[in-house]
Amino acid sequence: LSTDCISEDTLKDSGAEHYCIKYARAYRQNINWLKTFPCNIIFIDGNHDNHEFWAKLPTESWNGGQVQRLPDAPNVIHLMRGEYYTIDGLTVWCMGGAESIDKATRTQGVSWWPEEIPSQKEMWHGMDTLEEHGYDVDVILTHTMPRMLMSAYFGNSFTLKENDPTGVYLDEVYRRTRFRKWFCGHMHEDIDKPLFRLQVLYDDLVSIDTKNPGFESTEQEARHGEEGKDP
């Protein structure tokens, strides 16, 4: 999801990208491209990020919460798990990470990291920051979604992902928190159900009008330029 890419404005990603990998040429190409953006690019981690890499980086305070910057592209900013920010006038709470259902086919430390699942400390920290703000926030950004909503969105398509402890944790966040919109990724589909105020993103970009008191969002095709796609 994104705002206008001007001055202090920001592009946001729900944890689908993992540039810190051991493929030097592709990594360098991506970094050189990201550095050209005249704005901050902020993201939450997913389940395929190199979590060991990010764990070694220093943190700093940014817009009310802790972040990490990519050393080779300082405009690329990692929003950390359980942190609470004010961005473009909106309050934002974040929780990256999720369980990989294909981890048995991956190699630990190369294509899979056990830290993909938020730790108990990170989960408690997330609840503490929400409690400090009265369980009230404009936007929630997570990689995966609450487990209790999966069947409403996908039927029986993602039963393996229902065992993810991250989704169980997010059930409690969903129950306790007053929020205006929740965005997540992980499912590799684009689907929005206004009844639940949660939108799953994959190819779509969402532009939030921060000046609109109704907090309306508009969808655009992100990569493929397809026309006439169902909402």
Where in this protein do the model-derived segments appear?
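Long, low-complexity, intrinsically disordered segments
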Residues: 224-231
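General small-molecule cofactor/ligand-binding pocket signal
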Residues: 77-79, 93, 201
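Short hydrophobic/charged patches on amphipathic alpha-helices used for structural packing
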Residues: 31, 127-131, 171
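Conserved beta-sheet core of the metallophosphoesterase superfamily
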Residues: 40-44, 55, 59-74, 145-219
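Core catalytic region of metal-dependent phosphoesterases/phosphodiesterases
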Residues: 1-86, 159, 166-167, 175-176
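Active-site-proximal loop/helix segment associated with metal-binding centers of metalloenzymes
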Residues: 5-11, 65, 88-164
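Active-site metal-binding loops of divalent metal-dependent hydrolases
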Residues: 1-3, 47-49, 82-83, 96-99, ...
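Short, surface-exposed amphipathic charged segments that create phosphate/polyanion-binding patches used
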Residues: 82, 88-96, 214-219
